[in-house]
Amino acid sequence: MIIKVPATSANLGPGFDSVGIAVTKYLEIEVLEERDDWYVEHTLENVPSDHHNLLIQTALRLAPDIKPHHILMRSDIPLARGLGSSSSVIVAGIELANQLAKLELSMDRKFAIATEIEGHPDNVAPAIFGQLVIASQLDNQLDYIRAPFPEASLLAFIPNYELKTSDSRDALPKHLSYKQAVAASSIANLAIAALLKGDMEKAGRAIENDLFHELYRQRLVKEFHSIKQISKKSGAYATYLSGAGPTVMILCPHEKVEGIFQELTDLSLDGLLERLQIDEKGLQVLF
């Protein structure tokens, strides 16, 4: 059995802590033989290989009595880069418990559990459902809308350095004025409406006009300004920080992607530039 979970890119500018897309990088968990103790085989640095691994901790939270197994973990989702690496592990852990303990959890229940563990829905929602997901968590009320993402190409610049979510959150202001909040909300409303309508020109402008977080976080990613400037000049719809950063995501017309890719490659930035696509399936279990 293989559990497959996509990477995710959250916020999309003004959709702070509530909007995300699933993209084509993956965590795969292969469940092998039973053992006396848990063994998670992987090649990641500073990640536990025993029951302290987040995958196993999540599974045991739901089903404490499941039998230990040899688990093979494969992932091309980089850690601490704003692509939902921890969310993918949490979602995989929930599915691991669901399969081994035969819990028969609905997708909505998996989403609720993942949101409770993660603390916010913006990454776990697209990791589970795929595509574009807009979600809201207010007290005990959790709602979401899944929608197809408009036609666009994606480029991701993944820096060779980490940016911890805690550091990125520390850069945010403690309060927004009422006037600022109204303006930020109107921008977010337009961004979502344009995405649902398939109007990437208007969506792109709204994404880049975010007032909730990018103004304060851009300085933490030294490449952001030059990437945004070149991408816009070359015809991109929008450039935004993926999640808490430092990954920078570019949305562009299909016919512009190769030109933008080459322009950014010529900058010789310290990181990896990748072409990505929207993942449409979300969480998968392969037998």
From Swiss-Prot:
Question: Under which EC number(s) is this enzyme classified?
Answer: 2.7.1.39
Q: Where does ATP bind?
A: 78-88
This chain's function reads:
Catalyzes the ATP-dependent phosphorylation of L-homoserine to L-homoserine phosphate.
Q: What is its main location?
A: cytoplasm
Entry-linked PROSITE patterns = GHMP_KINASES_ATP (PS00627)
The UniProt catalytic activity note for this protein reads: L-homoserine + ATP = O-phospho-L-homoserine + ADP + H(+)
Among InterPro entries, the record links this protein to: GHMP_kinase_C_dom, GHMP_kinase_C_sf, GHMP_kinase_N_dom, GHMP_knse_ATP-bd_CS, Homoserine_kinase, Ribosomal_Su5_D2-typ_SF, Ribsml_uS5_D2-typ_fold_subgr
By sequence similarity, the record places it as follows: Belongs to the GHMP kinase family. Homoserine kinase subfamily.
Query: What subcellular compartments does it reside in?
Result: Cytoplasm
Signal sequence extent: none
Task: List cellular component terms (GO).
Answer: cytoplasm
Tell me the GO molecular function terms.
ATP binding; homoserine kinase activity
Tell me the domain of life. Answer: Bacteria
- Keyword annotations for this protein? Amino-acid biosynthesis, ATP-binding, Cytoplasm, Kinase, Nucleotide-binding, Threonine biosynthesis, Transferase
- Please give the biological process terms from Gene Ontology that the record holds: threonine biosynthetic process
Descriptive protein name: Homoserine kinase
Which pathway does the UniProt entry assign to this protein?
A: Amino-acid biosynthesis; L-threonine biosynthesis; L-threonine from L-aspartate: step 4/5
Pfam families in the cross-refs: GHMP_kinases_C (PF08544), GHMP_kinases_N (PF00288)
